[in-house]
């Protein structure tokens, strides 16, 4: 079967078909079960992180090395010529002359698409502002499939910062292709953006607002937690919502046995440490799946056959 992702940019989940997502998912699962160390042999990957990252940067670099490739790059845009005023377009032109693919994280929405326009090699978006995070979405799909045995018709609850959280935007855009049903738990000021709910409506996916994490845990197959970002509130407004969207183990008392709690990490206080021992907690395993998801992306983008 032809590889539908060979030499393709990976910029946004909305650019990918269900066939392409399924190809990525199955390749990640295959590489997890049967690792290969030759798929990036002789390949050099540019790791271009203009803002801080722990899991995404290290898991991409781990993926490259486990596949037999090598990495060059930077972990802070302040130490590059961007500090001198070099445009992102010129940076992409230059680095694409050195490497076989570019993995880029940038604080500005749309930055990955700009880089792709000027790069001579595939660009993989490792997060652009509040916009998209497609490799996180793939590891989420791998984790959901691994824990539920399917993606079709699942009940997905999302909680916390749904307005600015790029992970939940991308995940909605992916899971709508499998007819999932959604529930949202957030303060009104951090509700899911209209453009996402409109896409769900166009895909005939039902969604609802729920008032508490207890309700969400009882209803859902997957409870996807995110951090409510204190810096986006004044002190008085934050005081009104503080603790309301923090998950504790006692809140999972009526959860279905198959419920899994996910989180893109890092967490602060939105998941209490007592949840870690609950059978529903799966966020650390989810983070581990980042390596296999990113191995799949790199392998498919840089090989005609995998």
UniProtKB/Swiss-Prot annotation:
The keyword Cell membrane does not apply. It catalyses: carbamoyl phosphate + L-aspartate = N-carbamoyl-L-aspartate + phosphate + H(+). It holds the Pfam family OTCace_N. SUPFAM superfamilies: Aspartate/ornithine carbamoyltransferase. Keywords: Pyrimidine biosynthesis, Transferase. One of its GO terms (biological process) is amino acid metabolic process. It is an enzyme of class 2 (transferase). Carbamoyl phosphate binds at residues 55-56, 105, 133, 136, 265-266. Pathway: Pyrimidine metabolism; UMP biosynthesis via de novo pathway; (S)-dihydroorotate from bicarbonate: step 2/3. GO terms for cellular component: cytosol. GO terms for molecular function: amino acid binding; aspartate carbamoyltransferase activity. Its EC number is 2.1.3.2. Belongs to the aspartate/ornithine carbamoyltransferase superfamily. ATCase family. Catalyzes the condensation of carbamoyl phosphate and aspartate to form carbamoyl aspartate and inorganic phosphate, the committed step in the de novo pyrimidine nucleotide biosynthesis pathway. Heterododecamer (2C3:3R2) of six catalytic PyrB chains organized as two trimers (C3), and six regulatory PyrI chains organized as three dimers (R2). This is Aspartate carbamoyltransferase catalytic subunit. The gene is pyrB.
